[in-house]
Amino acid sequence: MQISIVAKTIGLLLMVFSFAQVPPLIIDLIYAEGEYLSFVYSFSLTALGGLVLWWPFKEVKKDFRLREGVLIVVCFWIVLSLFGTLPFLITDSISDLSFSEAFFESMSGLTTTGATVLSQLDEVPKSILFYRQQLQWLGGMGII
């Protein structure tokens, strides 16, 4: 098992996923909802997490086999869902959301389940709603 190639790949994918925070950030700035810091912090933490995983192994030039490929897919679903919780946890507009509920919301979006634990969706900022829908779109792209 070549853990170095797994860490390098997950780090690279996390850095790419960090850019998923940019469209909701722009939506927040357009509607002036005041939630932009949650997306800035999420972008920064996700990009930094990816960089920490990728940097030590950036020179590794090995190809991964089936075993590493399966581990990358499994780890990526979990890691991506964990980092996907950040905007839900950092936002001020959804103050009563626990970590498990935020993780459920993120995993539900990325697996295109469509289930939600958020109540009163009409009161949730448009940027958070856009982020939820974007997670579902990204999950759909991952399934295709």
Task: For the regions a language model picked out, list residue spans one by one.
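Membrane-proximal intracellular helices of multi-pass ion channels
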Residues: M1-I144
